Structures are given as structure tokens and as C-alpha cells.
Amino acid sequence: MSTLVVRTIQTPDGSPVSFPNGIRIGTAIGAGTMNNIGTPGQQGFGVGIAPSLPTGFSKLYGTEDPTSDTYGNYQTTDGSVMCYIPAFYYKFGTGANGYALNVCDIKPFSYFEAVASAAAAGYALHRAFYNGGSVRPGFFVDKYLVSKNGTVASSVKNGVALASATRTLATTPYSSIGQTDNYRGSIGVAKTRGSSFHAKTIFQNSALALLSLAHASAATGSTYCAWYSATSTNYPKGCNNAALGDANDATIAYTSDGTTGVTGKTGSANFLAKTTHNGMNSGVADLNGLLWETTIGLTSDGTNYYLLNTSVDVNTITAGSTLATDAWGATGLAAMYTNIGATYGALTASNSNKPFGSAAQVLSEATSGTAWAMAGAGIPLATGTGGSNQFGNDYMLDYRPAEMCPLVGGNWSNSVYAGVWAVYCNNVAGTSSDDVGCRSACYL
């Protein structure tokens, strides 16, 4: 008989802990253990098992099986499928910190006792896992771009993606579910599923991109990374060649959604795993192409860039430009954001396209401060552009408009410039476009 003595159980930030699914005891590590992001390059990496579930969430058959296509996937009451992304630490390689330049190592949330001990080892907890002033164990994010489901924006396979403007069909604009037809409307779109949901942040998007980068570096074949390439295209593929396929992979074929003739249905690729962030059917689909996606968390007043504070609960952010809770406007900027100045790294308001990647260091290795937060937003260092295959040569549009609303991923015709790192900073919140949609997310 074994004896277990437990004095304290708490999260690294001291917040309450509950175990509705019980506690697993054993020596297993990696995919298949609770709240574990897995091992880069291996089966199950990039998603995981949630330690508890918000109201309205349920498991799918296979949710807790790392060999399953639905591993780490959950369903909400409206039928939406969401992927659970457990919190993780990362170390971005500088060539002098134990990892080769621009190689990223990932460790699960449980690997370090606390954020401080991780930082002492050169690892940072990703910015995506801070919300409302506390460290969160993970977040759920839509597996697919949202589509109309009555009056709800749902994440379902083979949907016709909603957009901020009509795309031929009356079922495509946000207004078809009672929301505003512009980029700021994505905040209301997310809330159609419930008050605990929010529009995907730029930090959450960057976390998915970083996981794909780490997976690419560690993979040695396509067994657990379907989009793997030993040469020049080692990154997720998508609907981006204006012909329902991918500019870098001629085997990809999407099903038309019946709008433009070149826009695919959500998650409809014939090889789904080639279009997910982790190269497996369990991952988040269509981050490269299909439709641009709005994000919140980084904006501008036309003079300076502003970064959302970790103290802000993104569930409380509103879509206007006058209130202290508004994502845009002077009052909201003063209440919720930090002014990081007129430039940061490769963001210099040069009004130009800057391809992602470089032979020099691309992202900061910082474990705290502005450099850490901007790396968490997926913004490269001044040395981090010029283009490289490692980062897909994805495009960053370097602008600084007032009420900036960054778009990520690319659309159905952006070709090689689309990708998981692509970010366009030339758009404002009040704009609308038929090739710009969104995803919802929910913190645990």
C-alpha cells in the first residue's frame, strides 16, 4: 500500500484549484496527461486535456486519447468544436542560450514550479496565458472560423465562414446574426456564444504560431506533422492560391463555400492535418489563408502603439471607442493598455510589407517586459524581417493607423504571403471586408 501526503495544491499564481475529473497519479509525461501541451514533434503535441470544463463544454469521444483525431477537442452547447491549448513555457533560441538561432523549445505548464523559476532557466510563460491579472492554465480556441448557426457564430466543420461584409450570400455577414458589419463587430460575434467567450487575441494567435514553429523544428517526418517538409515549406498549409488550394502544396483541395468560387468551407481541406497548427487532425484549422481574422490586444492611436495589459479581463472588452472598456479610443487606451511608443522592433510605421523571418534573430527571448509581451503578440525584432522559409515568408504590413485592428493569417488568394505568422497592421476597427472573419476563444 502507498501513502499519499498532500499539504498544498495550488496553481503557480495561487488561484483556486478544483479537480472535477479527479487527479491522475503516475510517472507519465507528455501528451495524454492532464493540462500538458505535449512534446514538439510527437503525437498529440499542441493541444491537450483540460483539467476542468467551463459551463456548457463537454468532451468528445477521443478527447483524452492522444492518438485520436479529437484529442484535446471539446464541444459547446451550440455545437462548436474548440481546441484546448494548455499553458506552456518557451525558450526562443539565440544561438547562445542552449538553442540554435530561431529554434523554439516548449515545456509544459507543470515543468517549472513557478514563472520565476522558469525565467531563471531562460523560459517564459507565453503572454497568451495571462488574463484578468492572473495566470490561466489554458484557453479554448475555435477549431474553425465561425459560421452562421441561427443567431450564433459557431465553429463547425464545412461551414460558410462569416465575414465583416457580405460575400455573395445573405448568410455571410455579421449582420446576419445581429452583429455589426465591421472589424470591431467580432467582439459581439464572439459573445453570441455566451458571456465567457471573447474575440481571439493576437497573443492567442501568436501562441498557435509558436507551437507550429516548435513542432516544425522537432519533427523528422510527416507521421505526426502532416505538413512537414525537409526543405522549404515546413509550416501549416491552407486555402490561399485563389483556386481552393495552397500555393506551396498542390495536393491540397478545399470544397467551395458557394460564394466567390475560390473560398473554401471551413475545415474542408482533403488533408485536414496539413492545414492545422500541429499537423494533426486534432489541431486548429485554417490559420493559413481562407479568411483574414481580426484580433484584439495590439492597437494604435495613429502616433504610438499600445499593448493590452495582463491585468485586463478580455471578456469585459467592448467594441466601441469611448468607454474605459472599449478596445479602441483614448479612454480605453488609457484604462487598459500600455503605450510602447512610436516604434517597436520591426514595427516602424514604414507603410511597407515586411516578410517574416531572417538569418538573424526573429523574436525576442525576453522572459518579461515589453520585449516579452511583443514577442507574445508575434511582432518580430528589428532584425527579424527580410523573409525566411522557416517563417513561411509570411507578410507583416507595417502601418500605424488610429484604431488599428491587426488582421492575421491571410485570405483565399494571398498565396505565399499568407500564413500563421502573417499580420496586417494597416486596418482600422471600423472597416469591413468580405474576406475578414474571426474566431472565438474562452479562458479556463
Task: Identify the role of each PLM range.
Residues 1-34:
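Intrinsic low-complexity, repeat-rich intrinsically disordered segments enriched
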Residues 14, 88-91, 145-148, 204, ...:
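Acidic glycine-/aspartate-rich tracts in secreted/extracellular proteins
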Residues 27-95:
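GGW-centered surface loops in extracellular recognition modules
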Residues 78-79, 106, 111-287:
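Short aromatic-cysteine micro-motif
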Residues 91-97, 148-153, 416-417:
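Short, solvent-exposed loop/turn elements at domain surfaces
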Residues 203-206, 228-248, 252, 256-260, ...:
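C-terminal, surface-exposed recognition/capping segments
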Residues 301-312:
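A short, polar/charged loop-to-alpha-helix boundary motif
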